[in-house]
Regions:
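Helix N-cap/beta->alpha junction signal
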Residues: 15, 89-90
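Hydrophobic structural packing positions in well-ordered secondary structure
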Residues: 8, 59, 86-87, 142
Length: 143
């Protein structure tokens, strides 16, 4: 099974939105048994929390339900378990590489990339909408 992890800072805005969008795409393609999708944050200060209410509302307008998702921090094991880790911005990439246990070859499996490498028409980084109201634009970028 191919494993894909979306990562942002707190795992309450961008990465849960990306997780829900990708899960819908995987389900629509009938590939639920081939592709596993999850999300996490580079910081743990929202660990166990629901996504931000504004993310929930934005996703709902697009037919997605984020209410069952819970924030979790990136773990060392993620680098061994996931095939691809897609970060929302350059700071997330840097934080991920700081968390990767480089001395242990088991944790070298995951490839870390910025999500917008796959959609360069949107620039380099998906902005964090937490401090401003860019939730619809962020949804569009990720989708």
């Amino acid at each position: 099974m191919y494993k894909l992890l979306f990562v942002c800072t707190g795992n309450i805005c961008r990465s849960p939105t990306a997780e829900a969008i990708m899960r819908r795409l995987v389900k629509t393609a009938g590939r639920e048994h081939e592709i596993f999708v999850d999300s996490a944050g580079t910081s743990g200060y929202h660990s166990g929390d629901c996504p931000d209410a504004r993310s929930i509302e934005c996703a709902a307008r697009h037919g997605l339900d984020l209410r069952s998702l819970r924030s979790r921090p990136v773990r060392a094991e993620d680098f061994a378990e996931f095939d691809l880790i897609l970060a929302m911005d350059e700071q997330n990439v840097w934080n991920l590489e700081q968390k990767r246990p480089y001395r242990d070859p088991r944790y070298q499996k995951a490839v870390v990339r910025k999500i917008l490498e796959y959609a360069p028409e949107y620039g380099e980084n998906v902005p964090d909408p937490y401090y401003h109201n860019g939730f619809d634009y962020v949804f569009e970028m990720i989708e």
